[in-house]
């Protein structure tokens, strides 16, 4: 790994160093204790848990400012969480996650201590769409609760799952939130048109949200599907209510993501909505 020259000690667990003219952040328990600017470090004399090379000056400045406002105990718990996530089977971009997750947990903890809880309306959608990330996020929250002697609400599992998933999916946090929002509004339309309450544990719900997720991805890549004309006519005639509902949902998606919607897309979404209708008729 070579030699690291300390340029700044952020706290007992984090130091900023240079290595071959590259500024890096070293993280490890007690790594910054009594370390002064100009001191030389190497992995023989200290235990380095993580090395981060933050690419942009904005990332570096933001991370440094975060570390400076967090106490050592909170930061160590965050470091442990990052290590835990990195050691899972998910292919996480640690350089991106270290900044976003540190930022999120520091301020979520501060809000919790001040009894300010932000609700997450997309917990169920996140759980279904990104189940692996959600499972890991739940374990992270359990660790945070135990280490910090607090009780983060389930909303936070959803938020952290999105941070994790955005580092493994080809979507940004913003895009993932938009998709969750579209799915939630779509379910609202279905519940209104079919006069029902959708069971969010049902197979129909899981299939619907998966379909919408991949539908949006395809449309953004300009990948379109085509159904035969006679099939389109048959579905429109057989399931007019479901077709009308699908049309409303896809019109919303069209406006939200500025994409083109074909008649075939409406037909295939109609079939998914019909599954909800069938479930209602069976109950």
Swiss-Prot record:
This is Protein GlcT. GO terms for molecular function: RNA binding. Residues 69-173, 174-283 form the PRD domain. It holds the Pfam family PRD. Belongs to the transcriptional antiterminator BglG family. GlcT subfamily. InterPro entries: BglG_antiterminators, CAT_RNA-bd_dom, CAT_RNA-bd_dom_sf, PRD, PRD_sf, Transcrpt_antitermin_CS. It comes from the Bacteria. SUPFAM superfamilies: PTS-regulatory domain, PRD (SSF63520), SacY-like RNA-binding domain (SSF50151).
């Amino acid at each position: 790994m070579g030699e690291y020259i300390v340029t700044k000690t952020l706290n007992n667990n984090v130091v900023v160093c240079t290595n071959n003219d590259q500024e890096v952040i070293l993280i490890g328990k007690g790594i910054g204790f009594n370390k002064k600017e100009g001191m030389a470090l190497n992995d023989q004399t200290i235990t380095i848990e993580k090395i981060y090379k933050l690419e942009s000056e904005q990332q570096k400045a933001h991370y440094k400012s975060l570390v400076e406002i967090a106490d050592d105990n909170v930061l160590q718990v965050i470091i442990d969480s990052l290590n835990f996530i990195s050691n899972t089977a998910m292919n996480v971009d640690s350089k991106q996650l270290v900044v976003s997750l540190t930022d999120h947990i520091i301020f979520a903890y501060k809000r919790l201590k001040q009894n300010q809880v932000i609700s997450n309306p997309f917990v169920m959608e996140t759980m279904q769409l990104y189940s692996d990330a959600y499972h890991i996020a739940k374990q992270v929250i359990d660790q945070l609760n135990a280490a910090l002697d607090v009780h983060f609400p389930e909303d936070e599992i959803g938020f952290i799952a999105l941070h994790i998933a955005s580092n493994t999916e080809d979507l940004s946090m913003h895009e993932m939130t938009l998709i969750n929002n579209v799915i939630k509004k779509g379910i609202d339309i279905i519940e209104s048109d079919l006069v029902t309450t959708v069971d969010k544990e049902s197979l129909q719900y899981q299939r619907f949200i998966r379909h919408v997720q991949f539908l949006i991805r395809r449309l953004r890549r300009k990948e379109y599907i085509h159904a035969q004309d006679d099939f389109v006519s048959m579905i429109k005639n057989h399931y007019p209510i479901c077709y009308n509902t699908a049309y409303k949902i896809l019109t919303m998606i069209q406006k939200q993501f500025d994409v083109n919607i074909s008649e075939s897309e409406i037909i295939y979404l109609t079939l998914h909505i019909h599954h909800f209708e069938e479930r209602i008729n069976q109950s």
